[in-house]
């Protein structure tokens, strides 16, 4: 046996954020041939290279300093051998040679001790026992793994070289302080399991994690991890995909413990993963009750190894054990059935036993319900908990309120180690309103389908199968958008619909975004038991990007089985755009095709619906909800229509180009689209799948029908229900049959309401006017009353007529106008006076250019419903749809004719309701209001409070009660209370139905004094809930833009804009120059939660940015002055100028502008808002004389260098010569001020500010070249620009290497900056000396060709530029370029033969000493 050698002469140096460490003995004695490298740079060491082992001292209770050189380990049948471990001290870490375990030694203070040895492993034996006794003990212990290692049942443990790991009697000790991630791997693995540990932190820093389903490959990590971060008391759950970490939850708070001990537990059952900390649920894939934010993933890793992870901590893991689960032991629930003795339970949907969510609807009289829970494991204990935290062991007679009632159902078993294993389900028992409420709502359309309760948007999965139309759609049980489900409705005639149970819930792959359903009639997918196939759904799973998952149904959509593999993911798409959604699939030419977008359009193909390949991509054609289908036109030609979300369309051909199926737009559509619907409220159009389209030679094109969602994402969709006071928010447009006509050589789409709507006409009450003469004074419809009707009209105007059309839903000063303007040939819908106006965008007139018929006539076919208007014209080639919310009493109509006269044919049909379960009632069943329930008034202001009783046909008799009548002066007229604020204070006013006193609405009103100091006239809230209290203007909002504008212009071309603001959160906008009171594209100054001030065009591009040198988020008022001249803007904060920008040109309104304020997603207070004439404003004395060394513009390039950080900025010729230096602040990984987008990343962040000789900030006028230094030994993943702390923009960059006169090299990233702010380097998670990353990353060319990767020699920078820190670029001289390899096969340099003879050891020793000396060079400059 060779003599053991213990290394004690360790060195360790900092290089950037990495440690270089090694042992000089290695170089002298030749026990290893590898040179010391940074721990994070080892590219060839895998989990198997480094092993963990238990080593026992002779007497663990003694405090001897004697080191035990060699000990023995036990290995019995069924028990993994325990190999050597590194000691639990941060400064004693060895680097293993190939195929050898890490070895070292430790004092006798621990019961398990590590030795450094190259000998074969010995058995674990008490040092005071005889050899035979050792064998007896070993044999006796063999069957009981826990007796050999009571702290863990992980087998064949190993770890990486970052930090130390040691198994002792009291646990697995690990120290990785300052080392970043330190992994412990094992050969134990599992698919379904419970895996837990008790971790105790020795210090209040670092994070401890369970690693599971791991591939045990530190160079290409694919695994899951859950952790507790002791410093921030946060829990995380994430996954690595090819070394890229993907967060699966938002960080969650963890309640601190007194002893710093936490129990981490993972329960995994196939795709469902749950994570508990101290038995509190932190994560559950698909559980939107726990977390609403989308955090999806690609195909779930089905199984893998167990491990541990220590991040920068010193900790002990105890009871680290896993127990496998199978079909008999997992605490699954097979079904939860809701029943009620008091009311009806609606049809139950499919219960997914391996998903956490389920919804069950019950009738209004079901005020109590019972849960019948079918346990899959009879040994499980089940408890039910309501939202208040009350726990029920007997889930019967559970009280439920009207609306959503979420119950938490926990199923628990005990594993072999005595630990609880729990799966947590949520069941939402949704109790309906009274039956009389439904379909009597004031704004419930009567012949447009809408969701009964909750939210609905995009139609999905439209399919006609076995005589039934299926309409799936996006759904959430709330009145605003949320975690997406697929709801389901069926019909046999496209007008009468039946709600079915919810079809799909969010799952581990993400939330259920839009998709489609096809009929796999020949079982091409192989998913079905028989050749006749069935329905296949292709669904977008959203979260961390987007992907497609499949589900299939063999019972006509009643139940579904999800396919266990993601069939297409954005990460594999050539466009590399995360917007990868809304698939629409069709069958053509004997294969499946899929169009999808969400961003850029793509077309894929497949033979089996499971394996998809890219056919063609369209990076410049962006849309949502694409659809593509063939139509045989009226001339017999087959053409293809590309629908862009139901908003616009193109017509062309679908054919192979270079072997790839491609949509080729006709010439008329190459550079433009046609409008599909000019109204705001028609979106996400989809056609019903009927059958195979056939082939090119034998097409079988069915009649195609589409439907749209009647709303828009552009502005107000989430406002509808709350504003008009209803419990549903989701209506769909009319079903339309599609066609194509050839019009003057261009194919035009026709959209015609399906014939079935004719059956809803009440022909007995219809009005028919044939060839009547109408003019501006006509009274043809003076006696008409209706809220749901159809108008079919044909106008033949005379030569003087300028407009024809209709006033719809007329009354109480309200009307919605549908007008054809003969002079401009424009068809429009004007709802600016239609009643309740949801937003400024809602009030805008929507229109489209439409030519008259060939004979000069105009056709207007209009469908009016309680809350919508749809118009069709020009042989149904033109369509427009808008929502409206008029006063329920506005039921009149009239004909519009202006300028002259017209002959007209007009028919008006009252429309019957489609709601077969609507209850007729003569008494009020609901009270609505379109007035906000919380109001802020100023003394002297007036407000109308109005309520409506439903149905609209009942008497609107209400009484009003006022809590403090002294504060207001009131008058009542019917269901309207007019009030005027007379005194400061707060009061409540309640409206009560006289006929049904159970119906009421209460308004809370705060009355303030307006002492806001300003010289601006007409200051008013354009959007938002701004209010003044005394001298302060307040506003707050969530995820919206609020505007507060002066209705009159200041009247000056040059002015000073002064205001005091107290920042609280969000983004504050100062509209310095706007073209009108809608500040779109206004010249704006923006402040946020950072040191950066931004000058930009509102809703447009950034103009310039500057660093203020401080943040203004200190809850104090800060004075902002913006000086606007004819062509410049100067910004000062608290008297300090922070930005000066000159414009080459400005918009015409820049010097005749409106001003105002804005807020995005935040809260703010303002005081003292004044705009004064700059020409009369006293100006401080200044010395305008230019310095001789500062010409107006640079005659040549100038380089500015910051010696402290090494940042270099190269200014272009022609740049302002007043810029003489750059001011740079720098933060790096784990800094307390780390921006949110850089959390958990390895980065360097530089805030760069150009400065003039007076230390004033100067904005650059031309793009500048920037060089940022790279930490030695690290690989740059990306270069980012941070416009604010919650957003990053990736920049293209190249790598250069500079060499100074002393021969020292430094690598930099080089990129172009349009303006200066915060720029950062983000390093790869696994940094290595040699590149092992992808050759190409987003916006980055990593191939480093000769012309990009340059080595440059410079003279001694610090001496040459110490005075003014500037230099001409010409002083930097280039030498021969060097090339950095980016080959994925790059490895560490060859360290020689392991059998190197002793004649080489002297050379190795010299190299070792040399490395010790130069290690310090790689330290950061600031260190």
Curated annotation (Swiss-Prot):
Its EC number is 3.2.1.80. It catalyses: Hydrolysis of terminal, non-reducing (2->1)- and (2->6)-linked beta-D-fructofuranose residues in fructans. Residues 1392-1423 form a propeptide. It comes from the Bacteria. InterPro entries: Big_2, Cadherin-like_b_sandwich, ConA-like_dom_sf, Glyco_hydro_32, Glyco_hydro_32_AS, Glyco_hydro_32_C, Glyco_hydro_32_N, Glyco_hydro_beta-prop_sf. It is found in: Secreted, Cell wall. Its main location: secreted. Residues 924-1002 form the BIG2 domain. Induction: By sucrose, fructan substrates and fructose. The active site is at residue 458. Residues 867-871 are annotated as: Involved in binding of sugars with beta-(2,6) linkages or binding of molecular weight fructans. Keywords: Cell wall, Glycosidase, Hydrolase, Peptidoglycan-anchor, Secreted, Signal. One of its GO terms (molecular function) is sucrose alpha-glucosidase activity. Residues 44-161, 1368-1394 are annotated as: Disordered. Residues 1-39 form the signal peptide. One of its GO terms (cellular component) is extracellular region. It is an enzyme of class 3 (hydrolase). Residues 69-126, 1368-1385 have a biased composition (Polar residues). This protein is a fructanase enzyme which degrades levans and inulins to fructose and also cleaves sucrose into glucose and fructose and can therefore function as an extracellular invertase. Belongs to the glycosyl hydrolase 32 family. This is Fructan beta-fructosidase. The gene is fruA.
């Amino acid at each position: 046996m060779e003599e053991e050698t213990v290394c004690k002469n360790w060195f360790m140096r900092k290089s950037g954020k990495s440690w270089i460490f090694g042992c000089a003995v290695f170089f002298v004695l030749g026990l290893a041939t590898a040179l010391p490298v940074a721990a994070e740079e080892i590219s060839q060491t895998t989990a198997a290279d480094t092993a963990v082992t238990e080593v026992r001292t002779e007497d663990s209770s003694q405090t001897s300093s004697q080191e035990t050189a060699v000990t023995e380990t036990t290995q019995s049948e069924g028990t993994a051998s325990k190999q050597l471990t590194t000691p639990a001290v941060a400064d004693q870490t060895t680097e293993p040679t190939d195929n050898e375990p890490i070895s070292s030694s430790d004092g006798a203070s621990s019961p398990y001790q590590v030795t450094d040895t190259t000998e074969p492993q010995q058995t674990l034996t008490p040092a005071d026992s005889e050899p035979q006794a050792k064998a007896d003990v070993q044999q006796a212990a063999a069957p009981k793994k826990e007796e050999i290692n009571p702290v863990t049942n992980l087998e064949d443990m190993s770890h990486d070289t970052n930090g130390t790991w040691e198994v002792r009697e009291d646990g697995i000790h690990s120290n990785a302080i300052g080392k970043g991630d330190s992994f412990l791997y094992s050969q134990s693995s599992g698919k379904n399991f419970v895996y837990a540990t008790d971790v105790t932190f020795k210090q209040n820093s670092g994070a401890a994690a369970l690693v599971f389903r791991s591939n045990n490959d530190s160079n290409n990590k694919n695994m899951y991890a859950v952790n507790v971060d002791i410093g921030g008391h946060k829990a995380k759950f994430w996954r690595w995909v090819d070394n890229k970490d993907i967060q699966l939850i938002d960080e969650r708070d963890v309640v601190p413990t007194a002893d710093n001990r936490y129990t981490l537990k993972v329960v995994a059952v196939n795709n469902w993963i749950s994570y508990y900390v101290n038995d509190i649920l932190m994560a559950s894939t698909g559980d939107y009750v726990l977390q609403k934010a989308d955090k999806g993933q690609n195909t779930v890793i089905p199984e893998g190894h167990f491990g541990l992870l220590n991040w920068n901590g010193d900790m002990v893991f105890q009871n680290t054990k896993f127990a496998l689960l199978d079909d008999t032991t997992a605490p699954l629930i097979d079904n939860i059935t809701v029943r009620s003795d008091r009311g009806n339970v609606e049809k139950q949907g499919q219960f997914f036993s391996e998903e956490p969510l389920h919804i069950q609807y019950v009738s209004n009289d079901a005020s109590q319900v019972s849960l019948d829970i079918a346990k899959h494991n009879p040994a499980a204990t089940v408890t039910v908990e309501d939202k208040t935290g009350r726990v029920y062991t007997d889930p019967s007679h559970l009280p439920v309120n009207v609306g959503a009632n979420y119950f938490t159902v926990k199923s628990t078993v005990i594993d072999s180690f005595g630990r609880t294993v729990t799966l947590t389900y949520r069941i939402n028992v949704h109790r309906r309103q009274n039956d009389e409420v439904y379909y009597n709502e004031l704004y419930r359309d009567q012949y447009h389908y809408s969701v009964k309760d909750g939210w609905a948007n995009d139609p999905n999965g439209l399919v006609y199968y076995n005589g039934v139309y299926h309409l799936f759609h996006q759904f959430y049980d709330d009145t605003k958008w949320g975690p997406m489900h697929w709801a389901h409705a069926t019909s046999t005639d496209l007008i009468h619909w039946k709600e079915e149970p919810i079809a799909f819930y969010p799952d581990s792959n993400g939330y259920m975004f839009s998709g489609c359903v096809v009929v796999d009639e020949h079982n091409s997918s192989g998913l079905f038991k028989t050749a006749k196939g069935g329905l296949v759904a292709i669904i977008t799973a959203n979260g961390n990007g987007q992907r497609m998952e499949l589900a299939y149904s063999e019972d006509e959509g009643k139940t579904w089985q999800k396919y266990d593999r993601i069939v297409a993911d954005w990460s594999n798409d050539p466009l590399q755009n995360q917007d990868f959604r809304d698939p629409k699939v069709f069958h053509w030419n004997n294969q499946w095709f899929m169009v999808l977008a969400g961003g850029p359009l793509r077309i894929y193909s497949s033979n089996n619906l499971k394996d998809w390949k890219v056919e063609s991509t369209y990076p410049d054609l962006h849309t949502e909800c694409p659809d593509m289908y063939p139509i045989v036109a009226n001339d017999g030609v087959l053409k293809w229509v590309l629908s862009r979300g139901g908003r616009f369309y193109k017509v062309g051909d679908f054919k192979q180009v270079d072997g790839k199926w491609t949509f080729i737009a006709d010439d008329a559509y190459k550079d433009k689209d046609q409008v599909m619907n000019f109204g705001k409220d028609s979106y996400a159009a989809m056609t019903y799948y009927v059958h195979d389209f056939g082939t090119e030679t034998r097409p079988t094109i069915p009649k195609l029908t589409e439907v749209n969602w009647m709303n828009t994402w552009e502005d107000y969709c989430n406002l509808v229900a709350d504003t008009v006071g209803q419990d549903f928010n989701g209506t769909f447009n009319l079903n339309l049959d599609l066609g194509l006509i050839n019009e003057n050589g261009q194919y035009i789409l026709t959209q015609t309401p399906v014939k079935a709507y004719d059956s809803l006409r009440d022909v007995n009450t219809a009005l028919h006017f044939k060839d009547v003469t109408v003019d501006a004074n006509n009274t043809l419809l003076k006696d008409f009353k209706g809220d749901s009707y159809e108008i079919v009209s044909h106008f033949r105007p005379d030569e003087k007529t300028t407009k024809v059309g209709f006033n719809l839903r007329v009354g109480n000063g309200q009307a919605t106008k549908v007008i054809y303007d003969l002079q401009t040939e424009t068809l429009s819908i004007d709802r600016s006076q239609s009643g309740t106006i949801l937003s400024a965008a809602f009030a805008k007139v929507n229109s489209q250019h439409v030519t008259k018929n060939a004979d000069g006539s105009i056709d207007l076919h209009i469908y009016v419903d309680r809350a919508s208007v749809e118009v069709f014209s020009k042989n149904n080639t033109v369509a427009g749809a808008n929502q409206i919310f008029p006063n329920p009493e506005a039921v009149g109509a009239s004909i519009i004719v202006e300028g002259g006269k017209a002959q007209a044919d007009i028919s008006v049909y009252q429309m019957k309701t489609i709601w077969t379960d609507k209850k007729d009632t003569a008494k009020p069943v609901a009270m609505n209001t379109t007035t906000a329930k919380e109001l802020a008034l100023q003394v002297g202001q007036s407000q109308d409070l109005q309520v409506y009783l439903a149905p609209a046909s009942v008497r609107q008799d209400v009484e009003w009660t006022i809590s403090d009548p002294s504060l207001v002066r009131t008058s009542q007229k019917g269901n309207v209370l007019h009030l005027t604020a007379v005194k400061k204070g707060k009061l409540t006013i309640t409206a009560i139905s006289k006929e049904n006193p159970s119906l009421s609405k209460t308004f809370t009103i705060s009355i303030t004094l307006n002492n806001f100091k300003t010289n601006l006239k007409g200051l008013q809230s354009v959007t938002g809930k701004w209010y003044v209290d005394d001298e302060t203007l307040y506003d707050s909002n969530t995820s919206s833009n609020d505007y507060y504008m002066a209705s009159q212009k200041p009247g000056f071309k040059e002015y000073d804009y002064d205001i005091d603001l107290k920042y609280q959160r969000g983004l504050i906008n100062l509209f310095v120059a706007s073209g009108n009171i809608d500040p779109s594209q206004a010249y704006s100054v923006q402040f946020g939660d950072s040191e950066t001030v931004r000058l930009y065009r509102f809703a447009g591009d950034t103009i310039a940015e500057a660093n203020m040198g401080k943040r203004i988020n200190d809850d104090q008022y800060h004075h902002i002055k913006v000086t606007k001249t004819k062509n410049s803007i100067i910004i000062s904060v608290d008297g300090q100028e922070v930005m000066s920008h000159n414009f080459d040109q400005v918009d015409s309104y820049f010097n005749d502008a409106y001003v105002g304020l804005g807020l995005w997603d935040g809260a703010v207070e303002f005081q003292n808002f004044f705009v004064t004439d700059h020409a009369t404003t006293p100006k401080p004395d200044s010395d305008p004389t230019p310095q001789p060394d500062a010409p107006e513009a640079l005659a040549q390039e100038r380089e500015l260098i910051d010696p402290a950080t090494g940042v270099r900025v190269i200014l272009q010729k022609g740049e302002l010569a007043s810029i003489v230096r750059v001011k740079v602040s720098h933060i790096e990984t784990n800094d307390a001020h780390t921006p949110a987008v850089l959390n958990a990343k390895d980065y360097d962040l530089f805030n760069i500010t150009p400065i003039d000789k007076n230390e004033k900030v100067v904005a650059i006028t031309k793009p500048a070249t920037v060089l940022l230094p790279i930490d030695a030994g690290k690989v740059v993943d990306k270069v980012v620009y941070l416009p604010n702390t919650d957003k990053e923009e990736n920049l293209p960059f190249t790598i250069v290497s500079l060499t100074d006169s002393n021969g020292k090299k430094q690598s930099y990233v080089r990129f172009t900056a349009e303006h200066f702010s915060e720029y950062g380097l983000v390093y790869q998670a696994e940094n290595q000396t040699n590149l092992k990353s992808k050759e190409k990353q987003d916006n980055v060319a990593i191939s480093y060709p000769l012309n990009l990767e340059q080595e440059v020699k410079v003279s001694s920078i610090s001496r040459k530029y110490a005075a003014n820190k500037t230099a001409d670029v010409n002083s930097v001289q280039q030498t021969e370029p060097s090339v950095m390899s980016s080959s994925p096969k790059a490895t560490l340099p060859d360290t020689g033969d392991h059998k190197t003879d002793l004649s080489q050891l002297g050379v190795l020793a010299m190299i070792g000493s040399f490395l010790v000396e130069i290690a310090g060079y790689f330290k950061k400059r600031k260190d």
